[in-house]
């Protein structure tokens, strides 16, 4: 475990980095803890199989008095693989999250932000452990894998004929590693995953971890729109009405996890707020960083000021 201290905007921030022992394996975490603050944000990266690295812009929220916790989920980034292959599930992920919450924040409630697959994990957590939440943020997340895949297939139909034809051809052959197919997949990503000319280094690190580990392939599949892993049938849309904590839903206009997916969640969580980032695809925290952080900060400020409830 390591520590270092920084001071920003008058806040004293202790950055703690290390491992927590959870269910017999080491889970990596990084905590930006603000002296004297009880406002807690826990972040969930996507994948499944990514790492916390690409979410690091959210660390800036500690400059405004918000404790920010990042971690690499089981089988991801710097964390260990689960001991049992049957643990590559969303259910195991939410129990891991609850154990980490207890170890880091004790009895304190949290605001939970999940991005992409992390948004699905955040929803699953809220459905079981809502009593520990001050608020929920579903950022380019989903409540139904089948519906999300259906929406991604619609986006493929809107691609230029060249790429659409290539994707369909190699999918029919079951050849997901052909260079021509991978080139078409990368074009899809350039439109709907990240629309920046240069990929930021933290995003590169996350993709490097995805390539090194087996979690993405086990839980998801060969790529973003071919989901054949353990999460392929996951759908909790009909349970969303049970979520009653303040909820923010964000999505990019060009998102691979589409606006329609976000609207489905918004429609089923009473009182939720939906924000669409007009110049973003799947990574608004990079594509519209300042606006994204402003929206997240505003929501957290509102959640912690509501009747001054603790």
From Swiss-Prot:
AB hydrolase-1 domain location: 41-288
EC number: 3.4.11.5
Catalysed reactions, semicolon-separated: Release of N-terminal proline from a peptide
Key words of the record: Aminopeptidase, Hydrolase, Protease
Domain of life (superkingdom): Archaea
Annotated Gene3D superfamilies: alpha/beta hydrolase
Catalytic residues, chain numbering: 116, 255, 282
Biological function: Cleaves H-Pro-AMC as well as a wide spectrum of amino acid substrates and several peptide substrates without a proline at the N-terminus. In conjunction with the three factors F1, F2 and F3, Tricorn degrades oligopeptides in a sequential manner, yielding free amino acids.
Protein family membership: Belongs to the peptidase S33 family.
Subunit structure: Part of the tricorn proteolytic complex.
Database matches in NCBIfam families: pro_imino_pep_2, ProImpepThrmp
PANTHER family: AB HYDROLASE SUPERFAMILY PROTEIN YCLE, MONOACYLGLYCEROL LIPASE
Name assigned to this protein: Proline iminopeptidase
